[in-house]
Amino acid sequence: MLASNPSDHSERGDLVRGLGLGSAIAIVIGDTIGTGVFLVASDMARAVGSATLVLIAWILGLLIVLLGAFCYAELGAAFPKAGGPYVYLGRGLGPLWGFLFGWMSSFLERPVAMATLAAGFVRFLGFLFPIVATPLFSSHIGGYEFTFTTAQPIATVIVVMVTAVNYFSVRMGGAIQVLLTSLKTGTMLVIVAGGVVFGTKHAGSTAPAITSFSLGTIGALLTALVPAMWAYNGFNDLGDLGEEIVQPQKNIPRAIIFGLLAVGGLYLMANLVYFLVLPFAQVAASPHVASDVVQSLSGSRGAAWLTVAMAVSALGALHVVVLTGARIPYAMARDGLFFGFAERLHPSLRTPTGALVFLGSIAALLALTGTFEELYSLFVFAVWIFFGLVAIALIRLRQKEPNLVRPYRAWGYPWTPLVFLAAAMALTVNLWMVRPVRSSLGLGVIVLGIPFFYRWHKRPRAAGIHCGRN
C-alpha cells in the first residue's frame, strides 16, 4: 500500500469540502482572468511589433498552458490535498522540491500575485481618477530609480481588505467567486460583441506586416509570452483547494480543462477586437487598452463603466489568489515544514487565519514597492521554474508508482509533459536574459529556502509525513 501523501490529513476534517464543479470552474476562470488580458496587449505589441505576432503569442501561450493543464489535472485528481504542487513535487521528486515550491509560493508567487492584482486594480482607478498616479517622491538606489505614488498605499489597503474578507467560509467564497466570474466574463463578451459590430468603423490603421521569421522574431515572441503567461496564470491553483472540492477526482480535471479553454477563447476574441478597433500604434502605447477600445466605441461613459467592471475583475482574481494561496503555507505548517503560526485555523470558520495574515502582510509590503510591470516579470520567472518541475514530477510518478490510482491521465503522455517542460525552460532562460536582475531576485528567494528546509525537516512530524515513505 502506498504511503500517505504530503499533507494527507483529510481524516482530521480540518478543512470543509464545500466547492462543487460550478464553483471550481468559476475559481479557475476567475483566478485566470484578472488584470492581464485588459492591460498586457500593449506590452506584447511593443515586444513583437505586429498584431499577428501578438495573436500568435496568445495562441502559443494557450497551447503551452493547456499542456500544463493536462499535467495538473492528472496530479490534482491523484492527490486531492491542500497545497497542490507542494504535494505533487514532494511525492514525485522528493521533500526538498515540494518544500521549495511551497517556500517560493509563500514568499514570492502568491504575495507578488496579490500585489500585482492590487496594482492592476489601482491602475484601473487611475483611468477614472488620474490623481491616483500622482508622484509623491522619487529616489535612486544604485542604478534603479524608485518612484512612490499615491497608487502604492491604495494598493496596500486593497490587499489588506481582500485578505480580511477571506476569513469567511469557503462556501461563501465560492458563491462570491461565481458572481464575480459571471461579471468579468460578461464584460469581456460585451467588449467582443461591440468590437465585432462596430470595430471596422473605428480601425485607424493596420499593424506592420510580418516579412520573415528569424531568431530575433522568436526572441520577441518569447518576450511577449511573459505577459501572456502572467495573464494565463491561475489554471494551476485549483489543486491547492484539493481538500475543499467535492468529488475532487472528477471535478478537478474537469474544472481545470474546461475553465482554461473558456479563458483562452475569451482572450483571443478580446485581442482580435483590440486590433480591430484601435490602430496598432495606439494599442502599443496605451496603458488601458480595453478601456480605450470601449471609449472608442461608446464614449467616455462606456469606458468608465468598463473600468469599474475591470477593477471588480481584478478584485475577483485577487480573492481567488488569497483563497488558494493560504492553503500552501497552511499545509506546510501542518507538516512541520513552515512557521508554526501558519497552521492556525479559525475556531469556528475553519479558515487558515495564520497563513492568511502571513501572505497578506508580505503582499501589502510588495504593493508599496513596485509597479504592475515590475511585479509580474519577477513573478513569472520563479513560477515557471516549478511548472517545469511539475512536468518532471508527473513523469517520475508514472515511472516509480505505475499502480497509483489515477482517475484522470494526461492526454498525449509522454509528449505532453515533455513539451510543457521544454516550453518552461525556454521561457525562463529567455526571461533571465531579458530581465536578469529581477530573475536573479526570484531565484535568490528560492535558494534562500534550502537552509530552512534542512532545519525544519529534522522535526519528527516533518520526517514522517513529507517524505512519502511507509
Q: For each predicted feature, which ranges?
A:
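Membrane-interface "cap" regions at the ends of multi-pass membrane proteins
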Residues: 1-42, 46-51, 65-70, 81-82, ...
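Hydrophobic transmembrane alpha-helices that form the core helical bundles
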Residues: 43-46, 66-159, 164-167, 311-331, ...
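Helix-loop-helix junctions that connect adjacent transmembrane segments
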Residues: 2-3, 8-16, 51-55, 132-150, ...
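TM-loop-TM module centered on a large, flexible mid-protein loop between adjacent transmembrane helices
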Residues: 87-88, 94, 126-136, 212, ...
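Helix-loop-helix connectors at the membrane interface of multi-pass transporters/channels
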Residues: 1-4, 90, 118-150, 187-190, ...
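A generic transmembrane alpha-helix motif of multi-pass inner-membrane proteins
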Residues: 199, 377-383, 412-470
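C-terminal membrane-solvent junction of multi-pass transporters and transport-like membrane proteins
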Residues: 147-150, 162, 341-353, 387-438
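Membrane-interface loop-to-helix entry segments
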Residues: 122, 150-201, 215, 256, ...
